[in-house]
């Protein structure tokens, strides 16, 4: 019998195709599925919890406005993202900038982004 470490080492050495076949074989052998219903349930529970307490807020960039460069600079400052990542985020609005933060911090971020010319929502 193989130890857990030996199994992990064997999995590390497999190709993506081999891993896919392994997952299918495990699903068939044990009658389980690798789908993620747990993630869906976890997301729903987190949403219900946030609605009940409302102590955590999300800052959503609704629109970058006309001064995208200023908005990108502020997004980089707030998130610590690189230039390309911040530009992609600003170009593909609406997108969350920060999630699960206190109301005071959300208001500060909103003010900074609006000062740069962006339209922002707090949810």
Curated annotation (Swiss-Prot):
Q: Which InterPro entries match?
A: Ribosomal_bL12, Ribosomal_bL12_C, Ribosomal_bL12_C/ClpS-like, Ribosomal_bL12_oligo, Ribosomal_bL12_oligo_N_sf
Q: Which GO terms describe its molecular function?
A: mRNA binding; structural constituent of ribosome
The record's CDD domains line, in alphabetical order, gives: Ribosomal_L7_L12
What does the UniProt keyword field contain? Ribonucleoprotein, Ribosomal protein
Q: Which GO terms describe its biological process?
A: translation
Gene3D superfamilies according to UniProt: 3.30.1390.10, Single helix bin (1.20.5.710)
Q: Which GO terms describe its cellular component?
A: cytosolic large ribosomal subunit
Q: Which NCBIfam families match?
A: L12 (TIGR00855)
The annotated subunit structure for this chain is: Homodimer. Part of the ribosomal stalk of the 50S ribosomal subunit. Forms a multimeric L10(L12)X complex, where L10 forms an elongated spine to which 2 to 4 L12 dimers bind in a sequential fashion. Binds GTP-bound translation factors.
Stated role: Forms part of the ribosomal stalk which helps the ribosome interact with GTP-bound translation factors. Is thus essential for accurate translation.
Name this protein carries in UniProt: Large ribosomal subunit protein bL12
Q: Which organism is it from?
A: Geobacillus kaustophilus (strain HTA426)
Species classification: Bacteria, Bacillati, Bacillota, Bacilli, Bacillales
Gene encoding this chain? rplL
């Amino acid at each position: 019998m193989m130890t857990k470490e030996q199994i992990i080492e064997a999995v590390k050495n497999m190709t993506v195709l081999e891993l896919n076949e392994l997952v299918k074989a495990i699903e068939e052998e044990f009658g389980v599925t690798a789908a993620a219903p747990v993630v869906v349930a976890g997301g729903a529970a987190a949403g219900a919890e946030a609605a009940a307490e409302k102590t955590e807020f999300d800052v959503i960039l609704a629109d970058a406005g006309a001064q995208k460069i200023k908005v990108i600079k502020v997004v980089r400052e707030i998130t610590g993202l690189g230039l390309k990542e911040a530009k992609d985020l600003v170009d593909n609005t609406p997108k969350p900038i920060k999630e699960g933060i206190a109301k005071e911090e959300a208001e500060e971020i909103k003010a900074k982004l609006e000062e740069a010319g962006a339209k922002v929502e707090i949810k």
